[in-house]
A protein has these predicted regions:
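Positively charged n-region of N-terminal signal peptides that target proteins for export
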Residues: 1-4
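Bacterial N-terminal signal peptides
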Residues: 7-18
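Bacterial Sec-dependent signal peptides at the C-terminal "C-region" and cleavage site
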Residues: 17-28
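N-terminal substrate-binding region of glycoside hydrolase catalytic domains
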Residues: 26-152, 272-325
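An active-site-proximal structural segment forming one wall of the substrate-binding cleft
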Residues: 100-111, 136-178, 202-212, 216
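Substrate-binding cleft/loops of secretory-pathway carbohydrate-active enzymes
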Residues: 181-211, 216-276
């Protein structure tokens, strides 16, 4: 870090995270972004463990392998046919999703789901028992597609969604749930099937699926595919996406770099309705397939992240192969994807007295492309040399979700000037009372987390204490 005051003597005594130089009363520190990938809730790279086909792309990984060397992986995505999850009515094969899910959960990552109703690589995405009960379907080139308006199909869909919501809704380990039981591959389109059987569905049908999912998922983020209104229509606003937005449902663009430029994507304009309020999710084409057809372009992948203000981006291939071929652009994307909360400067007193107010002034900036939707509050934690917590000072006047989003190198930080008191005393007719608080010289750390001081968001600094707190320097507490 750089010292704000050019004092070589002070710099020599500086700690590893910051190079503060004391005035007679305060220290000012400018933390330096270490450039590393961050693993934080609701952002980063998504590893596709199942991409419809169960072998793609987690089947080559050992049971303990979470591909930790791929920087910025925060989520594992499980997209698979309904027929594999509920092969018999009401009898669920939870093992198929919970086994890989727990591998990443215990590594501190999140999970995301898409259960599909129609597939063209296997006989059917929908379980046979649904059709045996009388749900109408169409046969297309050997596979089955349900009539998405059929009341028997819709009832079975709702029972499945209800069962999944009971298990997963509101779990902080779940990043999002895709509305996948309408359309091919869970992508909300029938472009491959309607020309064959002649049946098409529109807004009224699509709305039913949004309503079913939002009825049961009250807390977890839901998304629809950008293909709901048409896979290659470049308009920004559609009736179905406006409706989804009104219900708190975001979009997932499933078609990045499927075709070469200028058709590398179609719906960046659509994303502008969503990203200010909820995360936008991107899926690039299967990496190998994109390369084979000449559509893969590293710079365009970064541009898509910028244009869509994307929070999450797929690893849609064998993860280590994609990493080796794209390490340079992955590192650059990691500096921008989602949110990247930076404290640009902080000034705090060298010495404070118990039961006496003081101020900490800090400048904060989000240097990612998307808001920190879950939010969080800055916290200053004072610890002794053994790591014991002496004081916790939360700045609830600044929520990082309110920090603006700017182009690289643009915009200005937000300043927060907050008054704190350590070991405040209260006096009444019975006497004066205050919590026990030691005096002496301590370390002061910064973090971002919940309103009572638990860190939840990784910051781009060295000097982590193991709990997402980052050392700024020292502070003395006196009587």
């Amino acid at each position: 870090m750089r010292s704000v005051i050019a004092s070589l003597a002070a710099a020599a005594a500086a700690i590893f995270l910051a190079a503060p130089v004391a005035t007679s009363q305060t220290k000012t520190v400018e933390p330096e972004d270490n450039g590393k990938a961050l693993v934080n809730p609701g952002m980063g790279w998504m590893l596709y463990y199942y991409s419809n086909v169960l072998d793609n792309y987690g089947s080559k990984l050992a049971p303990e392998d979470t591909v930790e060397e791929f920087p910025g992986v925060g989520t594992v995505f499980l997209r698979l046919p309904w027929a594999f999850l509920e092969p018999q009515k009401g009898k669920f094969n939870w093992d198929i999703i919970d086994t890989p899910a727990q591998r990443w959960i215990q590594a501190g990552k999140q999970i995301a789901f898409c259960i599909s109703g129609t597939e063209n690589w296997t006989r059917q995405g929908t379980p046979q028992w649904v059709f045996d009960e009388g749900a109408k379907c169409y046969e297309v080139n050997g596979f089955l597609e349900a009539d998405y308006d059929d009341p028997i199909y819709l009832a079975a869909v709702e029972h499945l969604v209800e069962a999944m919501a009971e298990r997963y809704d509101g779990d902080p380990a779940v990043s999002f749930f895709a509305i996948g039981l309408y359309g091919m591959w869970g992508e909300g389109h029938t472009v491959l099937t309607t020309p064959v059987h002649g049946k098409s569905w529109g807004f009224d049908t699509q709305k039913k699926y949004i309503d079913i999912y939002t009825k049961h998922f009250k807390k977890t983020q839901l998304c629809i595919s950008d293909d709901f209104p048409g896979h290659d229509n470049r308009r920004a606003r559609f009736e179905i996406t406006d409706y989804a937005r009104s219900k708190g449902v975001t979009i997932k663009d499933d078609s990045i770099l499927v075709q070469p430029w200028p058709n590398s994507w179609f719906h960046a304009g659509m994303a502008q309705l969503f990203w200010p309020a909820m995360p936008v999710i991107l899926e690039h084409e299967h990496f190998g397939s994109s390369v084979d057809r000449g559509a893969w372009d590293k710079e365009l992948l970064l541009k898509a992240v910028e244009d869509y203000h994307a929070s999450l981006l797929s690893i849609h291939w064998w993860p280590r192969e994609e990493l080796e071929a794209n390490r340079d652009i992955i590192e650059r994307i990691n500096r921008r994807i989602g949110y990247r909360i930076n404290m640009k400067e902080v000034t705090y007193p060298e010495t404070i007295r118990k039961n006496e107010s003081f101020h900490i002034t800090a400048k904060w900036k989000n240097e990612g492309v998307a808001p920190c939707y879950g939010g969080g509050y800055p916290c200053y934690t004072i610890k002794n040399k053994k790591g014991g917590i002496v004081a916790v000072l939360v700045d609830t006047g600044l929520n990082v979700k309110d920090l603006g989003v700017d182009a690289p190198g643009e915009g200005f930080p937000v300043t927060s000037d907050t008054e704190f008191t350590v070991a405040r005393a209260e006096t009444n007719s019975f006497g004066t009372f205050a919590r026990v608080c030691p005096t002496g010289k301590f370390d002061i750390f910064v973090s971002v987390g919940n309103a009572y001081g638990t860190p939840t968001i990784a910051l781009p600094y060295d000097g982590d204490d193991g709990h997402k707190r980052y050392k700024l320097g020292s502070i003395t507490i006196t009587e």
